[in-house]
Amino acid sequence: MNINKLLKQAQKLQEEAKKIQEQMASLSFEGESGGGKVKATVNGEGFLLKMHVDPTLLEAKDNEMIEDLIVVAVQAAQEKAKEASQSQFQKLGGNLGIPGMF
């Protein structure tokens, strides 16, 4: 493989990676905990966009439980975003003929 071909392939990879990042940022992923009483929505980069806590949980006044449920819901949403991102980057590596790149 000559250097020019390698450089073109690297440039193409960089452009495609940027497109994937932009697409992922525009997507949203939801995680939940407590049987759906706590829901978190993150974008494809894992940033928290929205949080919903069922008012009945707030009435219980069990702050530690609520905090734990929030953490679990956010982590679940972030994990979904991470899996989607990894899937897209794996496809990118496969499309460029670079198996196992991501």
Swiss-Prot record:
Domain of life: Bacteria
Entries under Pfam families matching the protein: YbaB_DNA_bd
Manganese listed as a keyword: no
A GO CC annotation given for this chain: bacterial nucleoid
Keywords assigned by UniProt, alphabetized: Cytoplasm, DNA-binding
InterPro entries (alphabetical): YbaB-like_sf, YbaB/EbfC
Single GO term (MF): DNA binding
Compartments, as annotated in UniProt: Cytoplasm, Nucleoid
Entry similarity comment: Belongs to the YbaB/EbfC family.
Main function: Binds to DNA and alters its conformation. May be involved in regulation of gene expression, nucleoid organization and DNA protection.
Assembly and oligomerization: Homodimer.
Name this protein carries in UniProt: Nucleoid-associated protein Minf_1672
Organism whose genome encodes this protein: Methylacidiphilum infernorum (isolate V4) (Methylokorus infernorum (strain V4))
